[in-house]
Amino acid sequence: MNFIFITLFENLIRPYFDDSILGRALKNEKIKIYFFNPRDFTANKYKKVDSYMIGGGAGLLINTEPLAETIKAVLENFNEVRFIFPTPAAKKFTQNDAKRLSKYKNLCFICGRYEGIDERIVEKYVNEVFCLGDFILTGGELAAMCFTDAIARNIKGVLGNEKSLDEESFENLLLEAPEFTKPDIFENLSINSEFLKGNHNKIQVLKNQMANSKTRFFRPDMFRKVIAKKGKK
């Protein structure tokens, strides 16, 4: 898969792909990354890309024309591009979105700065808008990296053990159960003895119980969906 970033700050994003799982995926060509900078498509010698908002208001927007030219350059270089705009004025990105988007060939993230981008760019070019959470960031780069990470790990061959995807949070509407490692007793806190007996069926039952309890406590909204789903059976 190709991940394309329209950004004024390539150096904020590129180091994230230097190491760990995404670094290995990039090296093995499971994913590729590309960058397009609106400053390269400006008509002024100062490479200025900010513009005042029509109608007034605090802050600036990325100028519409260089941004549109940047998008057109992406379309000239890639086929069937799906454009995504990270913005707090949208629905929250979910694990289901990550799975669905992992099936596409070319994803392009338009990383806003200042107060964002002209809404007409969104209407004409953007396929999907997503929010990272109920808070404001200084730019779209961090959200785009989070979305990319979540999407990439659903691509075949990116994770070393793909079965681990089946046991993560949000699968089956539950948060992931707590996990433990050595030592058996840590600072007077012990692991449930069932984990130490090696009976995998009983361990799975225990994990399911713990996942239900964790979901009920931290995400009652999700737990209500679990109850509703069970009621339909």
UniProtKB/Swiss-Prot annotation:
Q: Which SUPFAM superfamilies match?
A: alpha/beta knot
Residues binding S-adenosyl-L-methionine: G112, L132, G133, D134, F135, I136, L137
Its GO biological process terms? tRNA N1-guanine methylation
Q: Which GO terms describe its cellular component?
A: cytosol
Tell me the domain of life: Bacteria
GO terms, molecular function: tRNA (guanine(37)-N1)-methyltransferase activity
**UniProt keywords, alphabetically:** Cytoplasm, Methyltransferase, S-adenosyl-L-methionine, Transferase, tRNA processing
| Principal subcellular localisation of the protein | cytoplasm
Q: Which reaction does it catalyse?
A: guanosine(37) in tRNA + S-adenosyl-L-methionine = N(1)-methylguanosine(37) in tRNA + S-adenosyl-L-homocysteine + H(+)
User: Known CDD domains for this protein?
Assistant: TrmD-like
> Which is a Pfam family this sequence falls into?
tRNA_m1G_MT
This protein's record includes keyword Secreted:
no
Q: Which PANTHER family match?
A: TRNA (GUANINE-N(1)-)-METHYLTRANSFERASE
Q: What does this protein do?
A: Specifically methylates guanosine-37 in various tRNAs.
**Which NCBIfam families does the protein's record reference?**
PRK00026.1 (NF000648), trmD (TIGR00088)
Family from the record: Belongs to the RNA methyltransferase TrmD family.
Per its record, how is this protein called by name? tRNA (guanine-N(1)-)-methyltransferase
Q: What is the lineage of its organism?
A: Bacteria, Pseudomonadati, Campylobacterota, Epsilonproteobacteria, Campylobacterales
Q: Which gene encodes it?
A: trmD
